[in-house]
Amino acid sequence: MHKQGVKLTSLLALALLVASCQGDRGGIIPATPSGQVEVLGAIPHAGTAWTEGLIVSEGSLWESVGGIPGSEVRGLDRETGAILWSVPNGGAFFAEGMVRAFGRTYVLSYTEGQSYLFDRDAADPFEPFASYEGEGWGLTAVGPHLINSNGSSSLFYRDPDTFEIVKTVPVAYDGEPVPDLNELEFDGKYVWVHQWRTPSVYRIAESDPSDVVRYELPPQVCPEGYPNGIAWDGELDLFFVTGQKCESIWKVRFH
């Protein structure tokens, strides 16, 4: 076959290949999926708060705020953002991720290597629980385990009674490890995690950690600081998202 015929045949083959990769979306299907974020509204948030953990509990938001001094756990009205109560830790440690599970409220420390049990009505609201190696970042609970992050590209499943590591799960997207995994949440099916200093949120299927979807928070979500705080509200069927130095808590849905 002469060169022109070879060229025409090659172009036809390429066109057929592209067409075979196209679906109803009218574009080439990406190797790794990305999702969309629907912003529903916002409530005020203290712009001075260095948010490290955010959860929904007892119909309100609970927030762990980092700082030395200045770390505390506070309750927020989920309709207005008003602070309902606040319990400082007296500068004992830099508070990080938090979760309420197994009849307890666990709070991590940043570099102190110590976890705590929080009880706002106790004489000592922050009772030392278990020590661990490395840094403490995000924290959530899945099934019979706690899960924490430490700024690496892995998640650590832990025994809720001893805080011993049960298994380690690496997180990758598009074939590359995802570094700086931070604040965590679990909605009953997926683990959600912020990537520090980015607008990226990753959804990880608990049943298959290789099933990962990335979402990019829009520019209006926490333009003042770093997004780092994600709380699932099953009653309202939405997520609350805020961050470090953010002046709002945003209500969003991920699609």
Predicted regions and their residues:
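Conserved beta-strand positions in repeat-built beta-propeller and related beta-rich domains
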Residues: W62-I68, Y106-E112, L146-S152, V193-R197, ...
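Bacterial signal peptide processing site
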Residues: Q22-R25
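Hydrophobic, well-structured mid-protein blocks that either form specific transmembrane helices
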Residues: S115-D174
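Blade-loop segments of beta-propeller domains
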Residues: G81-F118, P125-G138
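A short beta-strand motif characteristic of beta-propeller blades
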Residues: E38-P44, A82-P88, D124-A130, K167-E176, ...
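C-terminal motif of bacterial Sec signal peptides marking the signal peptidase cleavage site
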Residues: L17-S20
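Beta-rich, blade/repeat-based domains predominating
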Residues: A46-E58, G91-A101, Y132-G143, N148-S149, ...
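Short loop/turn segments that connect beta-strands within beta-propeller blades
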Residues: D77-G81, D119-A123, D159-F163, A205-P209, ...
